[in-house]
Amino acid sequence: MGLGANDDLRGIVRSLRLRMLLLPLFTIAGSLLFSAAAALLPGNRPLAECLAVGSGFGYYSLSSVLIADVGAASLGEGGAAELATVALLANVVREMFALFCLSLFARWCGRVAPISAAGINSMDVCLPGIVRYSGGSTQLVPLAVLHGIALEVSVPLLIGFFCRF
């Protein structure tokens, strides 16, 4: 069976290590780095807006609503709605790209690469693919779930921070 059918919750919790928090931290750093690089493209948005969009980590439903709400103070209603639409599309594309390329990420970049590429979706939509293409065992499931939860907690904090500029 899988993780949900496992009665040994204590053993699963004991298997979590502090080192596992490095993956979400590196995912956040990499996503923000590439979002900052997007600000350098000709005709693109300011750095803070690109970082706010990148802070969604694939969480399209929450990130677009937060950007529309928090960004209205600094961007105005129209600007915030436009940026929220960009965030929605960027995060949907991230999820679809991760979902369709999980096998390539695992083959070319290692077993944990699909977890990082999936972002928040590592704990739900992409989890079956992560298990399948990262060796077929449920060994990485606790890491994928921890990764998704850590990113989910960081989304409102980072979007709130970057939308203030």
Question: Residue ranges of each PLM-predicted region?
Answer:
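Entry/N-cap segments of selected transmembrane alpha helices
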Residues: 8-39, 84-96, 143-153
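Membrane-embedded alpha-helical core segments of multi-pass
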Residues: 1-5, 30-34, 59-62, 94-101, ...
